[in-house]
Amino acid sequence: MLGQMMRNQLVIGSLVEHAARYHGAREVVSVETSGEVTRSCWKEVELRARKLASALGKMGLTPSDRCATIAWNNIRHLEVYYAVSGAGMVCHTINPRLFIEQITYVINHAEDKVVLLDDTFLPIIAEIHGSLPKVKAFVLMAHNNSNASAQMPGLIAYEDLIGQGDDNYIWPDVDENEASSLCYTSGTTGNPKGVLYSHRSTVLHSMTTAMPDTLNLSARDTILPVVPMFHVNAWGTPYSAAMVGAKLVLPGPALDGASLSKLIASEGVSIALGVPVVWQGLLAAQAGNGSKSQSLTRVVVGGSACPASMIREFNDIYGVEVIHAWGMTELSPFGTANTPLAHHVDLSPDEKLSLRKSQGRPPYGVELKIVNDEGIRLPEDGRSKGNLMARGHWVIKDYFHSDPGSTLSDGWFSTGDVATIDSDGFMTICDRAKDIIKSGGEWISTVELESIAIAHPHIVDAAVIAARHEKWDERPLLIAVKSPNSELTSGEVCNYFADKVARWQIPDAAIFVEELPRNGTGKILKNRLREKYGDILLRSSSSVCE
């Protein structure tokens, strides 16, 4: 016997429609490339999104057509998010930090029909537009610009396009299982892979991220997604902000610590989301000018492991809760969030800090397990390390344009991470499977060593790689960026680890560099570091730390 309840479709258009109807006056603030701040509201965003959807339809676009964006976090990008997906098309966000060959590849692989771009990225598209045979139109997300038109004849001005739209356009009926948006992985090795999200997966993801034990979002919040909208849809915040009716602050291209500090204070931001390097910049800026935001209550840290020193500084100095989270493109992205349970209330400060270093527990909708190399499930005892597997409502089934059934293993997605899970379900990333150091039969976590290194007052960035070793097969090698004018030595760095890890885990050597190579999403390119420094211990007769 079936239940007798309504079955409404879970679609993206309904999110912005809800925001406009019940939170229409709530502000959406946008920092433009010029630095100018523009102000709108959810009602205006929804109206302009409908007009844009109408205009795209008049251009001949039909459901399931892909529309690419290459743009910063700004209000036009937000309008495109809702216009494209709401009309049944697929919004393909492109990371401009990819190599230009990769940008060409993903546009052609996605078979994008339209590319909408900020003027910042006009030189990139102008260089490659002749190599994009499927693209029928290029839209500059700004007012008409004669210089831009000279670079790319036929360029359409965004405001002109919206002006052609219909004020009375109504969101069409879309099946919740239809594709809504498309993101590509960072392509650390090989070409980027496409992950095609559905309306249903996106709405369910938004519901869960708003829950109290995830990000605890509400209409009273002012949300600042520092994480780019081209990086897994800004971790879903453009959708969850509309769902709860929060004020949304879009920071544009200026993501330095001083700019973010000023924006947080001026707009009363209560929650901000970004990667650790962003928060390092914010903390440095606030320490330098003595500022302290009165509104900020929590920051969400993902993308890479959050150092314990950062958690401590945010909490002890600024009274800000750090929500340590984990996810990936293939998980839309949220897989876990670290919020304490009832029995953690009485823990000591040091015990609470130790708990916060974990990436947290999966919310409803995601299941995790760890397995050994034979696929046997390992115990969730907080000690056993295994390959992390995931499944759930917003977890990938197949990569875009891949052979069906080639992505999963017995219905589970292999994340490529090595992790532990404790009896409460708290998951801790030990390393990427390809990065973990296997030394004399023991596993050494590069993540743990990097977290310790970054806590050193004279180190601003650090990476640890597995360097080949004649006796132990692999040993840890620290590659670090010193703070300006620091006279720190390799020996001093290695000695710094002495009371923090077991002796056999201490890096054999430390090398100082001007900067670490990173990919388009800010992740350190350890493959390049291994290529350059992987044999350095074979050429050295002894460890620097001996």
From Swiss-Prot:
UniProt superkingdom: Bacteria
Gene Ontology molecular functions: ATP binding; medium-chain fatty acid-CoA ligase activity; metal ion binding
UniProt key word Cytoplasm: yes
Enzyme Commission no: 6.2.1.2
Broad class of enzyme this protein falls into: ligase
Chain residues that bind Mg(2+): T185, E330
Protein name: Medium-chain-fatty-acid--CoA ligase
